């Protein structure tokens, strides 16, 4: 159908045939050149322009008045879907601006809803949608935003939308948001006074002003974390200490503008009610530790990591100040000031100390451990990692002098440990309270050391011996043969010299109580171990035989166990001898499985994997 458009641009056309012949319709006929129509392009195309929606013609003030009078949250959510403009306008309406005479559900919500945005999904637009959508559905109580660094699209506008629509907010986590500043945090503080937990990580735009706003408005704040916020300094901590009397836990990490003045003022002001203090990689000296030791009357958990400016005197004063009467847990990592003298002082000054963890404390030796054992009579667990000055004699001295309450001992990556001389006579006191023993990646630890521990520890339930090339069947047997109670968890991963004999002995002696057995990377483990487990173990529910020599026959032995194994987790990853022939047996075991690892099993085909995925739908399968 053809038509002639009027010059005015209206889309009216003459129906029917054309008034003129088309130049191409009659070949061979001469036509004079037509004159070009003097019609402007804008005039011609103006007829195709969409007319503006009538409601968009309204001034924004009028549209604001209309939207704030919507009678229900459901209608507000529906209107938010009309356009981004409407969504942004709705999200800018605070609860105080809503017309209460026409709204029935603007009462303060309970705040039980939780929302999390990560990476590219974290935008101002999504925050606006969350603010509008959750306001009528119980109220948002927890918000977690993980940005993507300088590519993050979350700004103060998005936080303002949340502040206006979510007054019931109690938990806020802002991570890696460089575009967020004090303006957005202040909006949250003023509009969400019920905040109890605040986590700020890698937000360089937030300074002391933002923390001051939090302190002035959020008096219920009980948990504060500040991590890698370069704009936050001592003044912000002072404001928190003055106003937030309900603060119970504080964690500060990698904030270069925070020093002794801020930390000391905080602990002096809030030490009587702060229970958890975590200081990591800060420019502080022994003064801060002295204040903690003097004023930290309520502190029960103390973490000190990477405090390079603290010397031995700082730890000595902290312990001898006698103020940490309630301290139960102490973790020290990469602090050059932690020495034998400091460790002894802490043990003497903290009578209720139960858990101690020392990591990369290179100046702590066996002398310090013995002093700790003699002074900290309530000690229940000790964890040592990369403390290379500790040797086997320090270990022996600690175990000989530790109190009757020690339940767990862990040693990892301590290169100063060497094996005892098998011909030397060793004392044989009892450490009957020890229930958990973990020795990991200590190259010098061998059979003689295990024999020594076997003389001390008769009540072990959880044994972890990992990456110990010097340990053989004889050493493990010496450790376990004097055990008076049944083992519950055994981890022998990466002990390449442990064989089927050890597994057989464990299954015979402790088969009725054993629940977890990890043999990952034990190169000498074969089907005989699985036969022993199937025959003697009744309660095992977690079995890891990854990277061993087991084959289809071993899996068949497990599936046909007379004890009807109730396995929940089975790991056979990296077992190249297991093939498709084990499919039926794995399916039989899968009746109770919740987790199955068949990664790097090269002889299990994709069709078998598909069958397992289809039939074991309750099980989480790694393939």
Swiss-Prot record:
Subcellular location as annotated: Nucleus
Induction: EIN3-dependent induction by ethylene.
Alphabetical list of InterPro entries matching this protein: F-box-like_dom_sf, F-box_dom, Leu-rich_rpt, Leu-rich_rpt_Cys-con_subtyp, LRR_dom_sf
Residue span(s) of domain F-box: 52-106
Pathway: Protein modification; protein ubiquitination
The LRR repeat ranges on this chain: 119-147, 151-176, 177-202, 203-228, 229-254, 255-281, 307-334, 335-360, 361-386, 387-413, 414-441, 442-467, 468-494, 495-521, 522-547, 548-574, 575-600, 601-623
Disulfide bonding pattern of the chain: none
Alphabetical list of Gene3D superfamilies matching this protein: 1.20.1280.50, Ribonuclease Inhibitor (3.80.10.10)
Tissue spec. comment: Ubiquitous.
UniProt-listed GO biological process terms: ethylene-activated signaling pathway; negative regulation of ethylene-activated signaling pathway; protein ubiquitination; response to ethylene; ubiquitin-dependent protein catabolic process
One Pfam family per UniProt: F-box
GO cellular-component term (any): nucleus
UniProt keyword annotations, A-Z: Ethylene signaling pathway, Leucine-rich repeat, Nucleus, Repeat, Ubl conjugation pathway
Protein's job: Component of SCF(EBF1) E3 ubiquitin ligase complexes, which may mediate the ubiquitination and subsequent proteasomal degradation of target proteins (probably including EIN3 and EIL1). Regulator of the ethylene signaling cascade by modulating the stability of EIN3 and EIL1 proteins.
Protein name: EIN3-binding F-box protein 2
Species of provenance: Arabidopsis thaliana (Mouse-ear cress)
Lineage: Eukaryota, Viridiplantae, Streptophyta, Embryophyta, Tracheophyta
This protein's encoding gene: EBF2
